[in-house]
UniProtKB/Swiss-Prot annotation:
Keywords: Chloroplast, Cytochrome c-type biogenesis, Membrane, Plastid, Thylakoid, Transmembrane, Transmembrane helix. GO terms for molecular function: heme binding. This is Cytochrome c biogenesis protein CcsA. It is a multi-pass membrane protein. PANTHER family: CYTOCHROME B_B6 PROTEIN-RELATED, HEME EXPORTER PROTEIN C. Disulfide bonds: none annotated. The keyword Transmembrane helix applies. Required during biogenesis of c-type cytochromes (cytochrome c6 and cytochrome f) at the step of heme attachment. Pfam families: Cytochrom_C_asm. It comes from Manihot esculenta (Cassava). HAMAP family: CytC_CcsA (MF_01391).
């Protein structure tokens, strides 16, 4: 009873705090001068992190195993992973470009986890025999951390595409009364090969320069985070294969979850291969990462919605009451 009450309190505190953080972010977008509000939002995410950590630890103590056995618990762990990614730039004293991605991601995953759809999963249950293995912590935690990092990195790529797909960007200063012109991403790629081109061309507006800088930062941050996520995903798949061999006598069974995990891994492997070519990095790799974003959600939710295959533990069915 005490554990259930504590879990209930921590769940709602974490969701309430991250909701306030989102509101603060929206205010700071409208008015940049509210520096104190920005600091408050960062502290709010730290509070959210500790609340979710407390929730996971409470459930871990009560159940006797790491809470990663169903969709509800994995969503909580996913929210926790997003909050960790959010805090990395903060503690390194860097400007937190991740906050626009990680805070909403934490909000939506935490909101879905606490929604009425997963009410039946909130109750603590004994772990099914197939999941009673030391590989549970290794495999599932690596997969969820990989999903979190890949989702964040892919969202940076989506933002990259949104900015670069703007039809017209004026590159001449209006004060010079010169002919207005525009450039598309092929020109951005050309400039990307020469990092200081925008600095050396005096008639380019500062607005276009900072847009270019933002594009470069989105591409760089996306690449870094996807690299980390890809490592976690690879470790998760390999540890899952070892676990499968111990449990079912085969490293790979082409289970729906395994198949989509392999497809997701392949897409991001293609992403890294594309980035080895300087002429293709940026725009083309961002398209591949955006496809990977969709595949991750298919891999993560697909089996849980269908409730089939060897990975259908903790799946849920949507019930409609009339």
């Amino acid at each position: 009873m005490i554990f259930s009450t504590l879990e209930h309190i921590l769940t709602h505190i974490s969701f309430s705090v991250v909701s306030i953080v989102i509101t603060i972010h929206l205010i700071t977008l409208l008015a940049d001068e509210f520096v104190e509000l920005y600091d408050s939002s960062e502290k709010g995410m730290i509070t959210t992190f500790f609340c979710i950590t407390g929730l996971l630890v409470t459930r871990w103590i009560f159940l006797g195993h790491l809470p990663l056995s169903d969709l509800y618990e994995s969503l909580i762990f996913l929210s926790w992973s997003f909050s960790i990614i959010h805090m990395v730039p903060y503690f390194k004293k860097h400007k937190n470009f991740l906050s626009a991605i990680t805070a909403p991601s934490t909000f939506f995953t935490q909101g879905f986890a606490t929604s009425g759809l997963l009410t039946d999963m909130h109750q603590s249950e004994i772990l099914v025999p197939a999941l009673q293995s030391q590989w549970l912590m290794m495999h599932v935690s690596m997969m969820i951390l990989g999903y979190a990092a890949l989702l964040c990195g892919s969202l940076f790529s989506v933002a990259f595409l949104v900015i670069t797909f703007r039809k017209i960007i004026r590159i001449f200063d209006k004060s010079n009364n010169l002919l207005n012109n525009s450039f598309f991403f092929s020109e951005i790629q050309y400039m990307a090969e020469r990092k200081n081109v925008l600095r050396n061309i005096s008639f380019l507006s500062s607005r276009n320069y900072y847009r270019f800088q933002l594009i470069q930062q989105l591409d760089d941050w996306g690449y870094r985070i996807i690299s980390i996520g890809f490592i976690f995903l690879t470790i998760g798949i390999l540890s899952g294969a070892v676990w499968a061999n111990e449990a079912w006598g085969s490293y790979w069974n082409w289970d729906p979850k395994e198949t989509w995990a392999f497809i997701t891994w392949t897409i991001f492997a293609i992403y890294f291969h594309i980035r080895t070519n300087k002429k293709l990095e940026g725009f083309h790799s961002a398209i591949v990462a955006s496809i990977g974003f969709l595949l991750i959600w298919i891999c993560y939710f697909g089996v849980n919605l269908l409730g089939i295959g060897l990975h259908s533990y903790g799946s849920f069915t949507l019930t409609i009451s009339i």
